[in-house]
Amino acid sequence: MRVVVLMGGRSSEREISLKTGKAVAKALRELGHEVYELDLDKELPCKLLEIKPDKVFIALHGRYGEDGTVQGLLEILDIPYTGSDTIASAVSIDKDFTKRIVKSLGINTPDWETFISEGDVLNTEWNKFPAVVKPVREGSSVGLKIVESLEELKEYALDLLKKTERVMVEEFVEGRDMTVGILKGEALPVVEIIPKKGVYDYECKYTKGMSEYRILKDEKLSKKLQEISLKISKFLSLKDFARIDFRVTKEGKIFFLEVNTIPGMTELSLLPMAAKEKGMDFKKLISIIIT
């Protein structure tokens, strides 16, 4: 099969995307595919029309890759691609919209408030601290910060609004971080994330030694997390592969955090770890996604 691996892009997650793309391209070549590695640029449509790929493996993270933009382009060009479609991608990258949907399904999610203007920030009466402040449409915990006071919240949110269109503040729920990989409509084993500091931020995700990971052995909790993940996945019409993040309190209450429609495929990535627990090595995982 002639496969284009699309990586890089212009989002703040460019470097992680390049790592994912290189790993995917290597696996595809070892599987016998004819592989082309392309960055996201203005010449992309022309390059794709020239190569005429059988499929595009989207290894882009964040803006333009996970928000439905490149999916829409590929649909216009009538080129099949991996992952969720334009609408599912656009919905899932929007943390505010996704939380509204998940809440409507009867699933717990931390309380939150979204700011679209300086006035929203200055007039907020948010009073739950500590709290998490982050961009609405970024991944890999880019821009995420824990704040301890209303003054700190306003200062950081105003700063973020200079760089992004919308910002949200979210209740900080004390508990354990869990993530569930979805592969072709099946929930993979649950991975527990143990960050060396209080929150699983960009540094903890992509710096060796900053987090520990283990397969959750609590069968009852695992089953519940998998059931919730499949419910969310089906409602959002996620395709091929995805990852859904949760926080579980010491009382066992489950809170949905966010959806990742193009989870990382680096040496520290969690979806390959979960797949390995099911007996799939990295090449097997990529083979399943591409078919």
From Swiss-Prot:
Its cofactor is Mg(2+); Mn(2+). Residues 99-291 form the ATP-grasp domain. It comes from the Bacteria. Pathway: Cell wall biogenesis; peptidoglycan biosynthesis. One of its GO terms (molecular function) is metal ion binding. It catalyses: 2 D-alanine + ATP = D-alanyl-D-alanine + ADP + phosphate + H(+). Binds 2 magnesium or manganese ions per subunit. Mg(2+) 1 binds at residues 245, 258. GO terms for biological process: cell wall organization; peptidoglycan biosynthetic process; regulation of cell shape. Mg(2+) 2 binds at residues 258, 260. Pfam families: Dala_Dala_lig_C (PF07478), Dala_Dala_lig_N (PF01820). Keywords: ATP-binding, Cell shape, Cell wall biogenesis/degradation, Cytoplasm, Ligase, Magnesium, Manganese, Metal-binding, Nucleotide-binding, Peptidoglycan synthesis. GO terms for cellular component: cytoplasm. Its EC number is 6.3.2.4. Belongs to the D-alanine--D-alanine ligase family. Cell wall formation. NCBIfam families: D_ala_D_alaTIGR, PRK01372.1. This is D-alanine--D-alanine ligase. It comes from Aquifex aeolicus (strain VF5).
